[in-house]
């Protein structure tokens, strides 16, 4: 019984620390993130409350400095958002975070990974949301424009169906 109580207490401490990291990422609190990393906290554990990953939240919310800290601490770039099963690059693309997209690409994230629900790549996400700078960053990173989503659409098809002429121009120029 004593062992069980000791183990339960340790689990509570771990959950509390993990929630602190996610709170610090969400609040863009660089000092707290740095301290948690110095204390040996792993960036590669999902938050127990939200089930999400610090690297995905930092990418989605545009926490550039925090994202750099996480990437330098070897954040796992294969982790997926618990809802859409999307990568950190998908999150950055959907939110229009071009700088974060560039950082993730530079650190070797899989650029053309498809989401399981709609088959979107990060390029599809950026284009569908009208984020031209993010789409440009993903294209410069080497994204394959010929990939089709589950509806059979390329990123160019989506731009055309959205009547987004600036995006169409970018995609045809970058072919």
Name each model feature, range by range:
Residues 35-42, 68-76, 102-110, 136-144, ...:
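Ankyrin repeat domain, specifically the short helix-to-loop turn at the C-terminus of the second helix
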Residues 80-108, 112-117:
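Alpha-helical adaptor scaffolds
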Residues 2-23, 107, 141, 150-153, ...:
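Ankyrin-repeat-protein effector appendages
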Residues 32, 65-66, 99-100, 133-134, ...:
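Conserved ankyrin/ankyrin-like repeat signature
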Residues 3, 7-57:
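N-terminal segments that cap or nucleate solenoid repeat domains
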Residues 15-21, 46-54, 80-87, 114-121, ...:
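Ankyrin-repeat boundary/"N-cap" motif
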